[in-house]
Amino acid sequence: MKTISTRAAVFTSPAVDVVGKAFEEVSASFERFCLAAGIEALSAVMEKDAEEACGPRHCRSADRRGYRWGRTSGKIGFHGGKIDVERPRVRARGGKELALPSWEQAVAEDWLGAWAMNQMLLNVSTRKFKRSMRLPQGDVPAAAGAALSKSAASRQFVALSAERLKEWMASDLSGPDILVVQIDGIHISEHLVLVAAIGIDGKGEKHPLALLEGATENSAVVQALIDNLIERGLDPAAPRLFVIDGSKALSKAIRRSFGSHTPIQRCQVHKARNITERLPKALHATVRRALRQAWELDDADKAEKLIRNLAKRLEREAPGVAASILEGIDEILTVTRLGLPNELRRSLACTNIIENMMGTIRRVCRNVKRWRSPAMALRWTAAAMLEANKGFRRLKAHKQLAALRIALKAHYEKNSSNRDLAHKAKAA
């Protein structure tokens, strides 16, 4: 079978001949037919741009902006690599080159960069990029400069992922009605930890919000994360629930920025895991059952009493663990104290959204053998979070979020009135 070349010579022939030749092989290579037809259409648009600047050929109009200056070839990246496309050159009366709008737009689209990024997110190794190109003849040796080498693919991914990370970390947050913010640490490697934030709006839709290098125990890191959210439009005065992994530094930073009355829910999954890891294996089932029973109660006072009784029972066998159970007990039962429905409590009592997202992050980062720098980890993880966002589903209990909004409003009004009474008493 004769292979259609994508060099400039193909596209200098008349449009009918090019499309006709491509159509002859459409049954064997429909992708090449589309590519040939698309490039010919681009060539026609560039000719039109040249005519608008110079007028019709052999016409010396007085109001023309420039004149033709031969032809040249340039490279445009597609999903199958870079190809040579011939284009007309136009110069202004002063001799300066005039850009063709259609050519500038085609180059700026960066189809090849977007294709390379999708390939990386699908775990295609850079060594296999040539074979994974969408044109059927993916195993045909690529011409020099086709940008299909592993180094070129890596450069394209680095550039585009860095650009996406920058755009994402500067995106406006004043639009979404964020009711819940979950913040948790993501362990990329033994010595590399990132802090991620995900929001849930009033309709139950999930939004990746931010990502920073560092641990949740680092007060400077968590404060920088929160400052970034506020600078991008997250209203610190709006009633909102925070779900965190249990870090004291994170709790302090939230209350410092959003107010001392801000409701914070500690992740119950993290809490149970931290407790059982310090206990003998024989006690694991008993302790988990007691904690689950407490968390499923609708009465926060009864739930707290049950947890305190559990701590008393463990004082003899594991006194250190007993103290750990009582640590942060108010924040463990926040969703219960707010009076939320049981199904909504289960959804908001832990940071499982971030935990579940780790599956996508591990899949996307599976081919990374060595993390060269924190910047590399940020780029890859941000790309994975945005990839995971495509598959996010609404919160299961999204119909009950109206109850959360009412409970948060009542909580804020109650604490506001208490502060006013305290100020009056102090003034008296």
Over which residues does each language-model region extend?
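Acidic/histidine-rich catalytic cores and adjacent linkers
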Residues: 2-5, 14-25, 34-37, 43, ...
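Short, amphipathic alpha-helical "recognition" segments used to contact nucleic acids or chromatin
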Residues: 111-123
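Short, charged amphipathic recognition helices of the HTH superfamily
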Residues: 122-135
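Inter-helix linker motif
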Residues: 260-277
